[in-house]
């Protein structure tokens, strides 16, 4: 087992990893930007090192500074959390070259799966269905030809995209020509690579994902499924476990696809296989090679401790192949400092009080500042009940009791969602929120 782990992240996920390390009696090292020197996660860690000024680019994405902190502290492993360097193959390789264990798959596997077009090609080779399209584009003429073959509407995506960035729904040749270079530039700035690809747009799909864990011996555990269809601009807002829409035979078919895909990968650690589900068919979207923001809903319904097990497997623990069973239904909402679309609210949390009957994951306290340099997530609020409808009702009560002031949030939207008859009846798809609030896709 590791003696000391450096956590290359911030906020609530850093605190979640610290808790897991404490359970395993592993010392923890935090890294932080100057603006966050008094943050809760810094105070909770056994040691802490400043790795740069306020911006994420200069601190939490500072590979060399983070590695230097790991070596100075005597850490023997680095946990990347999610976001930032969690799916950075270069960073994973640098860790290996420094004699540090990167808690995640090998750099070569991250590199394969980070390239969305390459990942879909791999899935096809494994006999896993993918959305029509998905081939990398050579030039603008190739773009128009493939769009005509697929038929409008189409989705234009960045090869190395993520977090809702670098993708657009396009309904005509005119829109395609107009958006092509804009998406390339967005991809270049966000992911340092302007490669893009086209795929067919599916108008009534649901987002279903499978949580997996695999050890060094290839022993695969399927730790349940989630539905994450409620999204704004391709960023998840509400997540549930299990995916209540699935019938037993559909769930079995989904897990067989997951097993087929994983059989071809020398994969170690936690991962999430994302699919679109429409017309009784699953289409592979991508694989996230890290801990997910929404991992806690799976923990609540399966009883698994995903972060602790992730660390143990990275340290060489063997697990037995299994398919987890569910107990109850869990819902997570993301309370964001985002009162309007793509607008990050900043300022002081003058009041911040959450309902004690829910599981809450947050890196903030009353009086803390929401800074403009990082993501909008303030807290994850989770509930579990015997049935989905009971869980929705409990979440509704929890949100009514949230007291937060000083900054704008999406709390009104979350309350609205929980009260909608269509949501309560589980009549949703990935465009549900866009239609609800009038967002352009």
Placement of each model-derived feature along the sequence:
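ATP-dependent carboxylate activation and anion-phosphoryl transfer catalytic cores
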Residues: 7-24, 34, 48, 71-73, ...
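Structural detector of well-ordered beta-strand residues that form the stable sheet scaffold
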Residues: 29, 79, 101-103, 131, ...
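Conserved anion/nucleotide-ligand pocket segment
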Residues: 152-159
């Amino acid at each position: 087992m590791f003696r000391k782990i450096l956590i290359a992240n911030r906020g609530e996920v850093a605190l979640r990893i610290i808790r897991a390390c404490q359970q395993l009696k592993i010392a923890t090292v935090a890294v932080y930007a100057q603006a966050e020197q008094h943050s809760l996660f810094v105070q909770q860690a056994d040691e802490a090192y400043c790795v740069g000024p306020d911006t994420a680019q200069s601190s939490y994405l500072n590979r060399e500074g983070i590695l230097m902190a790991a070596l100075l502290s005597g850490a023997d492993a680095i946990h990347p959390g999610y976001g930032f360097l969690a799916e950075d193959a270069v960073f994973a390789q640098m860790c290996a070259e420094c004699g540090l264990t990167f808690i995640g798959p090998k750099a070569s596997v991250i590199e394969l799966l980070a390239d969305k077009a390459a990942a879909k090609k791999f899935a096809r080779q494994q006999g896993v269905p993918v959305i029509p399209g998905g081939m990398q584009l050579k030039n603008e003429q190739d773009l128009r030809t493939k769009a005509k073959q697929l038929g409008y509407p189409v989705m234009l995506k960045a090869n190395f995209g993520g977090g809702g960035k670098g993708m657009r729904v396009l309904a005509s040749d005119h829109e395609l020509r107009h958006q092509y270079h804009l998406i390339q530039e967005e991809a270049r700035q966000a992911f340092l690579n302007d490669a893009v690809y086209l795929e067919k747009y599916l108008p009534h799909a649901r987002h279903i994902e499978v949580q997996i864990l695999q050890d060094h011996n290839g022993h695969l555990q399927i730790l349940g499924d989630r539905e994450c269809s409620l999204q704004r601009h391709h960023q998840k807002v509400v997540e549930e476990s299990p995916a209540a829409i699935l019938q037993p035979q559909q769930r079995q078919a989904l897990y067989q696809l997951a097993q087929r895909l994983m059989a071809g990968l020398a994969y170690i650690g936690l991962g999430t296989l994302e699919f679109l589900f429409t017309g009784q068919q699953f289409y592979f979207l991508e694989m996230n090679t890290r801990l997910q923001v929404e991992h806690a809903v799976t923990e609540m319904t399966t009883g698994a401790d995903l972060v602790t097990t992730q660390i143990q497997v990275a340290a060489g623990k063997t697990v037995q192949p299994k398919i987890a069973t569910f107990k109850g239904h869990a819902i997570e909402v993301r309370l964001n400092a985002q009162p309007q679309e793509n607008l990050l609210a900043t300022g002081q949390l003058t009041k911040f009080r959450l309902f004690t009957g829910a599981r809450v994951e947050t890196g903030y306290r009353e009086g803390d500042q929401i800074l403009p340099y990082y993501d909008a997530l303030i807290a994850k609020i989770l509930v579990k009940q015997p049935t989905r409808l009971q869980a929705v009702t409990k979440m509704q009560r929890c949100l009514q009791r949230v007291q937060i002031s000083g900054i704008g949030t999406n709390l009104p939207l979350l309350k609205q969602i929980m009260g909608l008859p269509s949501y309560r009846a589980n009549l949703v798809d990935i465009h549900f929120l866009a239609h609800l609030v009038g967002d352009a896709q």
